[in-house]
Amino acid sequence: RINGAMIDEDYVCRFTEEAQSLVEKYQPSFFELTSMMAFKYFADQQVDVAVIEVGLGGRLDSTNIITPMLSVITSISFDHTQYLGTSLKEIAQEKAGIIKHKIPVVLGPGLDKDTRSVFYRKAEDMEAEYLEAEYNSGITKLERTPSMVYSIHHKDIKNLSFELRGDAQKE
């Protein structure tokens, strides 16, 4: 999306046709292919800033090819364990792969001491400033509808829309 507008269907069709030989040759995953399309679309549209949410997360994520202005790590949980590891420390080590040389990183409040130390170490190795997000963002979810209503510091905001509607997006 750019300014809330979805990529138009014609662009998706043209991209699919143009990328067909690459798809046959490299057999990218669906996420890799849609990331590639999004990056091309953002470049074609000359966006000033793009907010990119990782899929797998970390070192192996297809979004990790970009050099961000800022990286954010909100939380660590047991997801994608077949790729990232079976302990929170192993998963944190993989997810720390998004920390880039001299690029600031924001660490979410839900990280425990052990995983947080993995990110501190990686940030120091990469000479990246790290910042700690405060625990209470003031955002609470009030209703679960297509256009959710959120309360931010006791002020209701209606029709605030997120493509994904989970607690991770609230963070």
Where are these regions (language model features)?
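Phosphate-binding loop of NTP-binding sites
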Residues: 1-100
